[in-house]
């Protein structure tokens, strides 16, 4: 026993001397950008293997008009019941807009800039997987190439995501380089995807126009001990003037008129609160 004591003591000293791995030791930074040309130099700031995560709405793509835009979605939350611009079953109407509307790149050179980046890439959106068709169409029409699947995965995957063990399950989908998370915490959803794919990146760079998404990703990666750079993309103007509000109200009334004439049962379902999304 006495012979073992010096060995045990030496091991104890070595353990105390070794630096502890703490989540708060991970590098974490956030900055504003208004040009996607700034993504490439940000990726090159370290020699670490880096995963580039890109939001879609108002980051890669934006709506040509106010109705159906990301800003319109936020405006909907402020409208009182009975306002002629407030839509019933908001996410059903959003899905209709995705299927029928058009979007453009947030900046003319955006697709070329993003397509040229050699890093592992992931498009991470809050959109529902049921809106996948319209999402892929608008990305293609704008000139964006879909990223290669991470880890060389041959097929996509869909699963019930829970942000906490007792949380309600929400269906998410990762396929063709696009991760659709149905409004879930993007940081927690990304970690769940990487865990399921048995992948690890020492550094993640997120480009997103939403401050909440930037902050959620920062919190999740810090807790996981992963270095993080959040690039808050501010190019798209979020202000709403009276002309926008008028367009928002007129847009929904135009939809109502079309649905009433062509698909009255769907309009009745929407206005009765029978939401599919």
Task: Please give the residue ranges for each predicted region.
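C-terminal motif of bacterial Sec signal peptides marking the signal peptidase cleavage site
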Residues: 14-15
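Short, linear, compositionally biased motifs with a strong N-terminal bias
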Residues: 10-11
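C-terminal cap/substrate-recognition subdomain and adjoining C-terminal extension
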Residues: 19-27, 33, 37, 51, ...
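Alpha-helical substrate-recognition element adjacent to the catalytic core
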Residues: 20-166, 174, 180, 277
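Sec-dependent signal peptide recognition
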Residues: 2-7
């Amino acid at each position: 026993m006495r012979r073992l004591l010096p060995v045990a003591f030496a091991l104890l000293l070595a353990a105390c001397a070794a630096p502890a791995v703490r989540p708060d030791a991970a590098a974490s930074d956030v900055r504003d950008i208004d040009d996607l040309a700034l993504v490439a130099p940000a990726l090159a700031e370290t020699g670490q293997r880096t995963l580039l995560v890109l939001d879609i709405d108002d980051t890669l793509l934006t709506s040509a008009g106010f109705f159906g835009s990301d800003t319109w979605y936020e405006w909907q939350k402020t409208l009182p019941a009975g306002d002629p611009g407030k839509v019933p079953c908001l996410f059903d109407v959003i899905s209709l807009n995705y299927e029928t509307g058009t979007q453009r790149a947030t900046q003319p050179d955006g697709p070329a800039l993003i397509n040229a980046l050699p890093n592992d890439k992931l498009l991470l959106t809050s959109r529902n997987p049921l809106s996948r068709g319209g999402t892929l169409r608008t990305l293609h029409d704008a000139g964006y190439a879909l990223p290669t699947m991470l880890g060389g995965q041959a097929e996509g995957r869909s699963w019930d995501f829970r942000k906490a063990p007792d949380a309600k399950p929400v269906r998410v989908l990762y396929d063709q380089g696009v991760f659709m998370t149905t409004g879930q915490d993007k940081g927690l959803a990304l970690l769940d995807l990487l865990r399921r794919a048995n992948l690890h990146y020492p550094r993640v760079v997120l480009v997103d126009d939403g401050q909440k998404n930037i902050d959620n990703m920062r919190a999740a990666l810090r807790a996981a001990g992963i270095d993080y750079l959040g690039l808050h993309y501010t190019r798209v103007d979020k202000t709403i003037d009276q002309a926008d509000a008028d367009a928002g109200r007129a847009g929904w009334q135009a939809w109502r008129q079309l649905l009433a004439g062509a698909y009255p049962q769907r309009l009745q379902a929407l206005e009765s609160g029978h939401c599919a999304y």
